């Protein structure tokens, strides 16, 4: 699923930023969205609030995965300058003061991606009589599916559980707990004496994913200077893709070692420890402290003082400096306004009515097809697929997986560069067509072309490349654009849960279905679903390129 997370923030940032210049109405300024985690996945009650002057227009962002930088009430893209909280000029800062508050939360994303890449090699090692180092290596397809998807089910549970406690915990404590869960999950999985303990470790690790993918984008967005917020959030998502590549790479080095799967999963331990110690050294989010004050959880002046101390520490300024005091005063006003605005929102059932239902059909359909065309299987089972596709040596299969990871990273940048130039529909239609072709090629390889392993490699590269320019980023860009303002947060919440749930199911079902149907028929099935998704894109998905959020609602959702 992270799988789709590599550049979601970047595209949402660009889409929302565009509307400011085209139609800077009060409604545009109040645009809000929830982002994914990818995935990860923020509470409906969560938001980050910023004030833009003049006019003191308040913008609220409801997050599920992406958070962006604001400029004049909208998001600022990488490197662009946005209004500060305190004045019309950008907030002054030193890069040295923002590196650690970015790096430590971003490690949560890297560990998420790492699990995807490492699992690809670990499944080969675990099932090898010679390399597993265990007596319980002979997994059934269902058991293998549970091992691979265990972290995803844990992430789903974590993302649901955090809804009720996120405001109480705060972003810093949430990320510390996530690091502890990552640490325990890595240790338990790496040292597991049997399958049951292994599954417990996978579940705990996944629970950490759910918390980290919720807390990390919030902490980064709420603590970094506004003019670089978009850059840092985009880099945070890039950490997930780098994590996937790192997992593939570690797998390729450890695949020939007896019990190498233990090292693959255990590698997350020192990274999780670094993340936990790093978050422990950082202060709480100043905006979260102000939110607690607005919620009536303590004395206003006490929370304001804590927020000023936290902001001063984050910026490397003396405690209680005047700049931090002014920033906190302005931030408190925006948090209070946004909190009161949240109370006046519509009820949950509105998502299933009128134009909202049309938006849910478009957004929910895209994230559903994103997963059921087999995308999770290609990443989690890349090593196994390559091994059955002619690279019988586990080392060869894992090394080719690294090539796939590098190609995925490169195609991510292609998508970033072209999505606003070419539009959503052309990239979706072309990309999904390529996905269908690649799946049919994989089916043909297993059925007719077994003597040509390069066909399988080419098909996998084609799949990854086409996914990265279509479903991967554009599904979440469309989701961030398509919902009407009043129901945007709730609609994107449903889209995120649809994505996470379908991802877990597809990942679990791949191994049993491969055993039951055969690889050639399974990829043929995925190819057929890809054709259905192509038809869905052609008939249902509109072009939103160049349209403001208001124009999307008035012209497309009428």
Swiss-Prot record:
Q: Name one GO biological process term.
A: D-glucose transmembrane transport
Q: Note the Pfam families from the entry.
A: Sugar_tr (PF00083)
The UniProt entry, under InterPro entries, shows: MFS_dom (IPR020846), MFS_sugar_transport-like (IPR005828), MFS_Sugar_Transporter (IPR050820), MFS_trans_sf (IPR036259), Sugar/inositol_transpt (IPR003663), Sugar_transporter_CS (IPR005829)
Q: State the annotated membrane topology for this chain.
A: Multi-pass membrane protein
Q: Where is the transit peptide?
A: 1-31
Keyword NADP listed: no
Top-level taxon? Eukaryota
Which terms are listed as keywords in the entry? Chloroplast, Membrane, Plastid, Sugar transport, Transit peptide, Transmembrane, Transmembrane helix, Transport
Mark the transmembrane ranges: 98-118, 146-166, 175-195, 197-217, 238-258, 264-284, 359-379, 400-420, 426-446, 449-469, 491-511, 522-542
Compartment annotation = Plastid, Chloroplast membrane
* Gene Ontology, cellular component aspect: chloroplast; chloroplast envelope; chloroplast membrane; plastid
MF terms from GO for this chain are:
transmembrane transporter activity
Checking Gene3D superfamilies in the record gives: MFS general substrate transporter like domains
Family assignment from sequence similarity:
Belongs to the major facilitator superfamily. Sugar transporter (TC 2.A.1.1) family.
**NCBIfam families found in the cross-reference section:** SP
Q: Under which name does UniProt file this protein?
A: D-xylose-proton symporter-like 3, chloroplastic
Q: Which organism is it from?
A: Arabidopsis thaliana (Mouse-ear cress)
What is the phylogenetic placement of the source species in the record? Eukaryota, Viridiplantae, Streptophyta, Embryophyta, Tracheophyta
